[in-house]
Structures are given as C-alpha cells and as structure tokens.
C-alpha cells in the first residue's frame, strides 16, 4: 500500500489504501450480517419449538431500529432481541441488553403494537435469545424471558 507523509511526519493512506480498508470493512460487515441471520434462524426455530408462533422477523420501526423477532406466546406478544456471538471474541450475548437498548426495544414494541391493532390481552414481553457459536460443536442457544 502506498503512503505519503502528512504534516508532523505521520503516515497517511492514499486512495488505494483507503479503498482496500473499505473492501475489508465490507467483507466483515457481510460476515456479521450472515452471522446475524444464522442466529435469527436458530432463535426462530427455538421459539417455535417452545410453542410460540413467529409473527414477523426483522420488523423495522422507521429510523428508530429493528425488532429481530415478533412472536406470540399464548395471549402475550413477545418482542425478541437476538444476539449471536462467536465463542471467545466478544462479551457473552446475554450481556447485550443495556438500559438504553431495553428502552429502545420498549419503544419499538409500543410502535409495533400501535401499528398492529393494540396490545393483546396477555400484554407485551421482551425476551432475549443469546446464541454462542463455539469453534467446534453445536451452537448454544439460551432464551431468557422478560429481560426488559
């Protein structure tokens, strides 16, 4: 990669170097997207196996964000956040629900309910499905109900 000297002797990437970095970033982004879709498929399967009905996946609430899975559990509506991680690289997926994230999910759930005819008799619950992908072996799927 070619570089040139900037003021104060620091190295600065030229156009080729910046483009190369962008291509690497795009590849990583595509890999993260594929990982997320795989995790969401595993989560939807787990929810279905536990008796829930998946109503929607990847519902977008305008610019405020996205609900990974909207499901029905009896007479309750479930807004489900899915976090998928490779083992050892990042924090555990269950650490993903911060107070700010919980508040955003509550707002998205409220918007979904408004757009779909009101709250069901069983209310609305926010769940988390955390998926840990080990280097070898089967994925570990954890479902925690009522996280926020």
Curated annotation (Swiss-Prot):
Pfam families noted in UniProt: UPF0102
InterPro entries: Restrct_endonuc-II-like, tRNA_endonuc-like_dom_sf, UPF0102_YraN-like
GO molecular function, one term: nucleic acid binding
Chain intervals for the UniProt region annotation (Disordered): 1-35
Family of the protein in this entry: Belongs to the UPF0102 family.
NCBIfam families: PRK12497.3-3
Protein name as catalogued: UPF0102 protein SAV_2633/SAV2633
Organism of origin: Streptomyces avermitilis (strain ATCC 31267 / DSM 46492 / JCM 5070 / NBRC 14893 / NCIMB 12804 / NRRL 8165 / MA-4680)
């Amino acid at each position: 990669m070619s570089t040139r000297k900037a003021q104060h002797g620091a190295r600065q990437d030229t156009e080729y170097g910046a483009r190369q970095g962008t291509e690497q970033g795009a590849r990583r982004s595509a890999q993260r997207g594929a990982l997320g879709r795989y995790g969401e498929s595993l989560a939807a399967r787990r929810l279905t196996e536990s008796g829930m009905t998946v109503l929607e996946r990847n519902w977008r609430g305008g610019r405020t964000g996205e609900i990974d899975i909207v499901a029905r559990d009896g007479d309750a509506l479930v807004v489900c956040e899915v976090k998928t991680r490779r083992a050892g690289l990042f924090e555990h997926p269950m650490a993903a629900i911060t107070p700010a994230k919980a508040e955003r999910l509550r707002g998205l759930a409220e918007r979904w309910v408004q757009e779909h005819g009101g709250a069901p008799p069983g209310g609305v619950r926010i769940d988390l499905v955390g998926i840990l992908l080990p280097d070898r072996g089967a994925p570990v799927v954890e479902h925690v109900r009522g996280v926020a």
